[in-house]
């Protein structure tokens, strides 16, 4: 048996007295500080580059870690700011229309409740106070000079000041002593901007998009030339025909209809008059659609995506540089003689300290020696900075994360008894997973039978409802066994376990409340809402597909793609929020039962009246319909008629150009390339796992990466050519 590099005794009683990274950096030995920095770098957490070289580095790091420990509060406040838009009463309602906004059916409003004026002010003041602390806290670890020279900090401060002024103006507006008219509020827009600036992934995506703006505008100009030229040909060609008399009545009308035809939303309706007059006219429209949709659109996508990858490579390179800077700082702490190299014994001391953290596990001397020799390019039994960075990366990727000792370790007589060890061994075994999968299948059958009987209003559904209640407590038992076996912290690391935990408890509590609550309580006595949660629980059946070889790669790829896509989907959501605020400001209140013009529009004809911009929830749903291009010209033409101006069309055209032609196409292209890249990685790992029997018999398995490591590997593999360019290694992001 291999001798471990670090024995269990050196971990401080099973790791319960772990050294906090912040304490190690501020008060630890050079090796403890270096280990904490390496651990931070491997976690993808970067201390601000400016404070790494400060003489007060330890004290600055202490305040930085205090700031990061409050991340949950900061994050909740970001979302609270954003969600306030959904619960604020629309500003047009403050003008006291007749009837009032309380008549939701008259204005086709959403069902979310509105905050009162007093509640809204209190909400804004609380979130603003937290935001002020969050904005100015970095001065404690960056220092005033660095803080006020950062453009990001200056923009944040400007947004906070604007938000403060807006809240003050709103307060004066609501008071009886001030003005009684407020035409505009900037707060809904500033909240979204603060949300973007405060979340690094969204901020990086915004920087990425701004970097490719020039390329996008160039290709957009080419698209405009194509559209203008094709519209001119159509206007001239059909001038004296029925098409020209009814549809292409002017060049502006022709341009408008040809733009919609470019999106195929009005195909073939727009050219039916021409087709009736001459079947040969279809040749023009068919060629236009083929060239526009299948050539010009894809040309735009190809050019934009190429620019996108170039900008993304710069960001990935920047993150690599941040990680390398952290590792260089750690290397400098170990290299006390400033020789530019460290030996194997110094590395061993470093990794002894790394066992205090969760990222890197215990490593045998033999395994560490093999890795060290493999990366020692000069064969002098010493490694330089470059080799040190490779060593840390190899350790992080080759070995699994160390499990955090369970709290039940405090009761060794029970936890380490023979019965307990047998139980924990069973929970860790595949048989336990098979048993839960079998129960899931039976539960799925029960849900199908119960819902079918419920639709048929059969009294036979009662026993099946009881069965679902029993299944709920079986899942509670499963959850308890996993927590007992792995410990809560290890259990909670897995996203699937978090999903199971939340859904299981909500269902069990809801079902219990339904059984014991009197029928007078309509919310709990009505179990319809629980049925949707039961269907959510059935999503766990997707895991069964992981056992099927032909589906395993697809499911694993999908799971990996989710976190890498979130910044781009989040950016689309933020753009929707900004456009929703504009829509409520410009179009709010136009859709109402007393507007005679409304019932002459296509919104009324198609029964789309609920999809309006009268409040924020309805506006977001309407924008989603525009995003997926579902009859989107209906809203554009209807609001043109309701406002009586062509300028309203710019709102919808700009939305199409930004969200659909740019953002949504980028997401589609990214998914396609990332999917095939992930399949290649899966195939490589499969081949590597079959290379030798020695690798299959390793005590710690290769390729067991964390989610962040898989995303990082995916991006580096996907952007390999771009990252290899010289400019990527020197670009300043």
Swiss-Prot record:
SMART domains in alphabetical order: EFh
Main location: membrane
Occurrences of domain EF-hand (ranges): 322-357, 363-398
Protein origin, superkingdom: Eukaryota
Topology, Cytoplasmic side: 1-71, 142-158, 200-218, 304-428, 487-498, 547-557, 673-733
Start-end of Basic and acidic residues biased regions: 686-695
Tissue and organ distribution: Ubiquitously expressed.
Modified residues (N-acetylmethionine): 1
Knockout mutant characteristics: Plants display an impairment of both the Ca(2+) inhibition of stomatal guard cell opening and abscisic acid (ABA) inhibition of seed germination.
InterPro entries assigned: EF-hand-dom_pair (IPR011992), EF_hand_dom (IPR002048), Ion_trans_dom (IPR005821), TPC1_plant (IPR044581), Volt_channel_dom_sf (IPR027359)
GO molecular function: calcium ion binding; identical protein binding; voltage-gated calcium channel activity
Residue ranges annotated as Vacuolar topological domain: 93-120, 180, 240-245, 261-282, 450-465, 520-528, 579-615, 631-651
Intramembrane segments per UniProt: 246-260, 616-630
Keywords, ordered alphabetically: Acetylation, Calcium, Calcium channel, Calcium transport, Ion channel, Ion transport, Membrane, Repeat, Transmembrane, Transmembrane helix, Transport, Vacuole, Voltage-gated channel
Location of the region described as Disordered in the Swiss-Prot/TrEMBL record: 686-711
Family: Belongs to the calcium channel alpha-1 subunit (TC 1.A.1.11) family. Two pore calcium channel subfamily.
Domains: entry comment: Each of the two internal repeats contains five hydrophobic transmembrane segments (S1, S2, S3, S5, S6) and one positively charged transmembrane segment (S4). S4 segments probably represent the voltage-sensor and are characterized by a series of positively charged amino acids.
Quaternary state and interactors: Homodimer.
Protein's recorded name: Two pore calcium channel protein 1
Lineage: Eukaryota, Viridiplantae, Streptophyta, Embryophyta, Tracheophyta
This protein's encoding gene: TPC1
């Amino acid at each position: 048996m291999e001798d471990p590099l670090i024995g269990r005794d050196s971990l401080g009683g099973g790791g319960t007295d772990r050294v906090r990274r912040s304490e190690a950096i501020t008060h630890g030995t050079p090796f403890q500080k270096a280990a904490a920095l390496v651990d931070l770098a491997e976690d993808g957490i970067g201390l601000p580059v400016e404070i790494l070289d400060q003489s007060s580095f330890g004290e600055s790091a202490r305040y930085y870690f205090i700031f990061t420990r409050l991340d949950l509060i900061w994050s909740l406040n970001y979302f609270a700011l954003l969600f306030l838009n959904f619960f604020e009463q629309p500003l047009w309602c403050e003008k006291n229309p007749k009837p009032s906004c309380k008549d939701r059916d008259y204005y086709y409003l959403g069902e979310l409740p509105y905050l009162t004026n007093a509640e809204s002010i209190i909400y804004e003041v609380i979130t603003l106070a937290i935001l002020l602390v969050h904005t100015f806290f970095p001065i404690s670890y960056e220092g005033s000079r660095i803080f006020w020279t950062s453009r990001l900090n200056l923009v944040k401060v400007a947004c906070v000041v604007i938000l403060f002024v807006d809240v003050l103006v709103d307060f004066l507006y609501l008071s009886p002593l001030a003005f009684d008219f407020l035409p505009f509020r900037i707060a809904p827009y500033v909240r979204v901007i603060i949300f973007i600036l405060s979340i690094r992934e969204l901020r990086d995506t915004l920087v990425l998009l701004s970097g490719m703006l020039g390329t996008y505008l160039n290709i957009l100009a080419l698209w405009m030339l194509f559209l203008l030229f094709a519209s001119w040909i159509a206007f001239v060609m059909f001038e004296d025909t029925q098409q020209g008399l009814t549809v292409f009545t002017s060049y502006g009308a022709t341009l408008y209809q040809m733009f919609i035809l470019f999106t195929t939303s009005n195909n073939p309706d727009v050219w039916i008059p021409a087709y009736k007059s001459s079947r040969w006219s279809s040749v023009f429209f068919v060629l236009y659609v083929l060239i526009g949709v299948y050539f010009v659109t894809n040309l735009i996508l190809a050019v934009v995506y190429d620019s996108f990858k170039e900008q993304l490579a710069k960001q990935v390179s920047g993150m690599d540089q941040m990680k390398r800077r952290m590792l260089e700082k750690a290397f400098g702490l170990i290299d006390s003689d400033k020789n530019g190299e460290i030996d194997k014994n110094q590395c061993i001391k470093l990794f002894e300290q790394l066992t205090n953290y969760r990222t890197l596990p215990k490593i045998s001397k033999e395994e560490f020696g093999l890795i060290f020799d493999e990366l020692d390019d000069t064969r002098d039994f010493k490694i330089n900075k470059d080799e040190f960075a490779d060593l840390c990366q190899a350790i992080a990727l080759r070995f699994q994360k160390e499990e955090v000792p369970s709290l039940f370790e405090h009761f060794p007589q029970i936890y380490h008894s023979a019965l307990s060890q047998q139980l924990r061994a069973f929970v860790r075994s595949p048989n336990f997973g098979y048993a839960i999968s079998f129960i899931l299948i039976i539960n799925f059958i029960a849900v199908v039978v119960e819902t079918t009987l419920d639709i048929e209003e059969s009294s036979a559904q009662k026993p099946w409802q009881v069965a679902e209640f029993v299944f709920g407590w079986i899942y509670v038992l499963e959850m308890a066994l996993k927590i007992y076996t792995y410990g809560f912290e290890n259990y909670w690391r897995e996203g699937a376990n978090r999903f199971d935990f939340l859904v299981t408890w909500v269902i069990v509590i809801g079902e219990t409340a339904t059984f014991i609550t009197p029928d007078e309580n309509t919310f709990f006595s009505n179990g319809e809402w629980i049925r949707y949660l039961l269907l959510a629980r059935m999503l766990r059946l997707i895991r069964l597909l992981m056992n099927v070889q032909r589906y395993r790669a697809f499911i694993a790829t999908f799971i990996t793609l989710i976190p890498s896509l979130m910044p781009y989907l989040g950016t689309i959501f933020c753009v929707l929020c900004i456009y929703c605020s504009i829509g409520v400001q410009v179009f709010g209140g136009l859709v109402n039962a007393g507007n005679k013009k409304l019932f002459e529009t296509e919104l009324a004809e198609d029964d789309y009246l609920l999809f309006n911009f009268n409040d924020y929830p309805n506006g977001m749903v309407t924008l989603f319909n525009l995003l997926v291009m579902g009859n989107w010209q209906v809203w554009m033409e209807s609001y043109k008629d309701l406002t009586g101006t062509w300028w309203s069309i710019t709102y919808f055209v700009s939305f199409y150009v930004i969200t659909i032609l740019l953002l949504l196409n980028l997401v589609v292209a990214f998914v396609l390339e990332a999917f095939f890249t992930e399949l290649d990685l899966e195939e490589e790992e499969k081949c590597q796992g079959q290379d030798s029997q020695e690798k299959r018999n390793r005590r710690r398995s290769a390729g067991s990466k964390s989610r962040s490591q898989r995303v990082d590997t995916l991006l580096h593999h996907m952007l390999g050519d771009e990252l290899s360019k010289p400019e990527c290694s020197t670009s300043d992001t």
